[in-house]
Each structure stands twice: as structure tokens, then as C-alpha cells.
């Protein structure tokens, strides 16, 4: 009987402790917090050979990187252009590139934020850091950065894009 009473007290204390932790986690999420999903794929440019819309992290000067970003609210709902005022990708050099929320596929099968950036002919080789900045309708901002691993980062490599034959 004594063991049961002690077990019941311990269980009650544990349950109250876990409830407090869960409540603290809920309170720690400020309004406007987002979850990000994203990738980069090779974007089709005229006369280039492709393949396109494939996941790659190494690009040659003159090739185009397509940034694809999905944003979710804490409740799991999509954060579209009605929930977010603007979404930009800021490259490591400070250049900001705006994304648009639009359908993708023909016919459209998905909606997400996207844009493409053609790597300039004079861009230095090496990895390019970037981050995504979402500005909410209330003016607050939320940032996301991809993994910080040089081998998987967006990278400019030497060479010319392969052209159609």
C-alpha cells in the first residue's frame, strides 16, 4: 500500500512537471513563427541541355538556381502570400532576391514560394551562403538558414553550362 501511494505521488509530480514543460514550449513560440521546407534545383534556361528541376548544389556561371520554399504556420497550415507579406533569399554577399508564391507544374500540382537566380559570369567560385527571410503581415521577420556544411552548400564551380546539341 505504501509503495502504491509513493508511486501515485511520483506519477502526479511527473505529470505536473511534464505539463509545465509542454505549456512552456507552447508559450515559447511567439506569434509569426514559421516552419520552412526548401531546396534548390537547376532551373531551365534557353539552349541549355539540362537536366532541369533536379536537386544539385554545384552550379556553373551562367546556370540558374531555382529556390523552392514552403512555409508552414505552427498549426501546420500553409503560410501563403496571405499570411506572409514578403519572402526573400539573402545571399552571403547581402544581395536580396524576392520570391513569389505561385503554382508549379503543368497542370499545377503544388504551390510554394520560388524564384530563380542566374549566376553572373563574373561570380567567384566557391560556396555561397544564404538565408531565407519571411516578413509577416505584422512586420515581424522570421529567418531560416540551410545546413552549414561546405560539401552540401550552394556552390559555384568553374566551367561553362552544357548547351543543347
Residue spans of the language-model regions?
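Hydrophobic beta-strand positions in extracellular immunoglobulin-like domains
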Residues: 71, 117-119, 134
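Aromatic sugar-binding surface patches on proteins
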Residues: 107-118, 124
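Short beta-strand elements
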Residues: 140-165
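Beta-strand-rich domain onsets/edges
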Residues: 25-66, 70-72, 159-165
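Short flexible loop/turn segments that cap and initiate beta-strands
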Residues: 59, 63, 72-100, 130
Amino acid at each position: 500500500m505504501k509503495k502504491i501511494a509513493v508511486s501515485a505521488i511520483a506519477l502526479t509530480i511527473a505529470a505536473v512537471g511534464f505539463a509545465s514543460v509542454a505549456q512552456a514550449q507552447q508559450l515559447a513560440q511567439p506569434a509569426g513563427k514559421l516552419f520552412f521546407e526548401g531546396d534548390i534545383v537547376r532551373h531551365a534556361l534557353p539552349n541549355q541541355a539540362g537536366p532541369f528541376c533536379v536537386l544539385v548544389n554545384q552550379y556553373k556561371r551562367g546556370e540558374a538556381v531555382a529556390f523552392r520554399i514552403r512555409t508552414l504556420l505552427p498549426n501546420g497550415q500553409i503560410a501563403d502570400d496571405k499570411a506572409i507579406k514578403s519572402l526573400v533569399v539573402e545571399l552571403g554577399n547581402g544581395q536580396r532576391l524576392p520570391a513569389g508564391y505561385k503554382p508549379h507544374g503543368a497542370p499545377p500540382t503544388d504551390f510554394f514560394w520560388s524564384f530563380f537566380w542566374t549566376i553572373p559570369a563574373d561570380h567567384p567560385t566557391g560556396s555561397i551562403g544564404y538565408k531565407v527571410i519571411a516578413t509577416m503581415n505584422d512586420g515581424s521577420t522570421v529567418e531560416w538558414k540551410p545546413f552549414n556544411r561546405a560539401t552540401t552548400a550552394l556552390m559555384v564551380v568553374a566551367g561553362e553550362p552544357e548547351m543543347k546539341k
